[in-house]
Curated annotation (Swiss-Prot):
Biological process annotations from GO: transmembrane transport
Solcar repeat residue numbers: 13-114, 126-214, 222-317
Organism for this UniProt entry: Pyricularia oryzae (strain 70-15 / ATCC MYA-4617 / FGSC 8958)
Alphabetically ordered keywords of this record: Membrane, Mitochondrion, Mitochondrion inner membrane, Repeat, Transmembrane, Transmembrane helix, Transport
Source species taxonomy: Eukaryota, Fungi, Dikarya, Ascomycota, Pezizomycotina
Membrane topology listed for this record: Multi-pass membrane protein
Primary role: Mitochondrial transporter that mediates uptake of thiamine pyrophosphate (ThPP) into mitochondria.
Transmembrane segments: 16-36, 95-111, 132-152, 189-209, 223-245, 292-309
Organism domain of life: Eukaryota
Signal peptide (residue range): none
Stated name of the protein: Mitochondrial thiamine pyrophosphate carrier 1
Family stated for the protein in its record: Belongs to the mitochondrial carrier (TC 2.A.29) family.
Length: 327
C-alpha cells in the first residue's frame, strides 16, 4: 500500500497546491460529463405524471418535449437542438466546477486540520466522523460561494435553441436576472441546495476516506483504479440519499418571470422546499421525486471518479515538482 493511499486528504499538499489541483479536477470533470448534466436537468424539470399517458399527451400539446430515458433524451436534444445543445450552459458550468472544486478541497483540508487541532491528540474524532464534518463544511461553503453560477447553468441547460432561447449570453442573463429578480434571483433554491449538500458531501467524504485505504491493494486493470472505485461507490451512496432535494433545487431555480419560457412550458409555481416536495409527491407521485436519478448516478459516479482521480494525480505531481525544486 503506497503512502499516497494511506495518507488522508487533509495531510496532503499545501493550500495553493490543493486549490490548483481542485480547480484542474473540476475543469476536466465538467467537460467529460456535460451532456449527462444537461440530460439530467431536462429530466428533472419534467412535471407530467410518469404513469398517466394523458398527462404526457397534454405536455406534447403544449409544445413541450416528453423525455423517456437517458439515451433517448440525448438523441432528442442532439436532433432538435444540434450536438452543441448537449453542452448548453457549459461556460457558467465550467466556471462553477472550477471554483467549486477549488473551494471544496481547500475548505475540506482546512476544516479537517482545524478539527484535528481543536480535538487535540488525546480526543481525536473517529476518522469517518472527522471526514463527514469536514466534507459537509466543504460542501456548504463551496455551494454558497458558487450558487449563482449553478443557477445560471440550470437556466441555460433548460432553455431551447434559436428563437426559443431565454438568455442570449451569459452577460445578458446576469443583467436580466439582476434587473427582473434582484440579487435574490441568483439564490433561488439555495435552501434545498445547502440542505442536500451538507449530507451529500459528508457522506461522500466519509465513505471515500473509509474506502480509500482498504481498496489500495486491490488489483485493477488501470492505473489509479482504486481511487476511482472508491469515489464512484461513495458518490452513488451519497447521491441516492439526497436526490429529492437536488430535484427540488432545480425546480425552484427556474422560478420567476421566465418560468414558462423554458423547454418545459408547464413548470408549476413553487414557493418553498417542503411545499415543493408536497406538490411533486401529490401531482407526480413518489417516483416524481426521483426523476433523473438514473442519469444522475450515471453522471455522478464517473464525475466523482474523474474529479478525485485527477485531483490526487495533479496534487501528487505538484508535490513531486515542489520537492524536486527544493532538492
Amino acid at each position: 500500500m503506497s503512502a499516497a493511499n494511506t495518507e488522508r486528504l487533509k495531510d496532503e499538499g499545501s493550500k495553493l497546491q490543493v486549490v490548483v489541483a481542485g480547480a484542474t479536477a473540476g475543469m476536466i470533470a465538467r467537460f467529460v460529463i456535460a451532456p449527462l448534466d444537461v440530460v439530467k436537468i431536462r429530466l428533472q424539470l419534467q412535471t407530467h405524471s410518469l404513469s398517466d399517458p394523458l398527462s404526457q399527451r397534454a405536455e406534447l400539446l403544449r409544445g413541450g418535449p416528453v423525455y423517456k430515458g437517458t439515451l433517448s433524451t440525448m438523441r432528442h436534444i442532439a436532433r432538435q437542438e444540434g450536438i452543441t445543445g448537449l453542452w448548453k450552459g457549459n461556460v457558467p458550468a465550467e466556471l462553477l466546477y472550477i471554483t467549486y472544486s477549488a473551494v471544496q478541497f481547500a475548505t475540506y483540508r482546512s476544516a479537517a486540520q482545524l478539527l484535528h487541532r481543536v480535538a487535540g491528540e488525546d480526543r481525536q474524532l473517529p476518522a469517518a466522523a472527522e471526514s463527514f464534518v469536514a466534507g459537509a463544511a466543504a460542501g456548504v461553503t463551496s455551494t454558497t460561494v458558487t450558487y449563482p453560477l449553478d443557477l445560471l447553468r440550470t437556466r441555460f441547460a433548460a432553455q431551447g435553441s434559436g428563437d426559443d432561447r431565454v438568455y442570449q449570453s451569459l452577460r445578458r442573463a446576469v443583467a436580466d436576472i439582476w434587473r427582473d429578480e434582484g440579487y435574490r434571483g441568483f439564490f433561488r433554491g439555495i435552501g434545498p441546495a445547502v440542505g442536500q449538500t451538507f449530507p451529500f458531501m459528508g457522506i461522500f467524504f466519509a465513505a471515500y476516506e473509509s474506502l480509500r485505504a482498504p481498496l489500495a491493494d486491490l488489483k485493477l486493470p488501470f492505473w489509479g483504479g482504486q481511487l476511482a472505485l472508491a469515489s464512484m461507490t461513495a458518490s452513488t451512496l451519497a447521491k441516492t440519499a439526497v436526490f429529492p432535494l437536488d430535484l427540488v433545487r432545480r425546480r425552484i431555480q427556474v422560478q420567476g418571470p421566465t418560468r414558462s419560457k423554458y423547454v418545459h412550458k408547464n413548470i408549476p409555481e413553487y414557493k418553498g422546499t417542503f411545499s415543493t416536495i408536497s406538490t411533486i409527491a401529490r401531482t407526480e407521485g413518489f417516483r416524481g421525486l426521483y426523476r433523473g436519478l438514473t442519469v444522475s448516478l450515471i453522471k455522478s459516479a464517473p464525475a466523482s471518479a474523474v474529479t478525485m482521480w485527477t485531483y490526487e494525480r495533479v496534487l501528487r505531481a505538484l508535490i513531486t515538482f515542489q520537492s524536486g525544486r527544493q532538492d
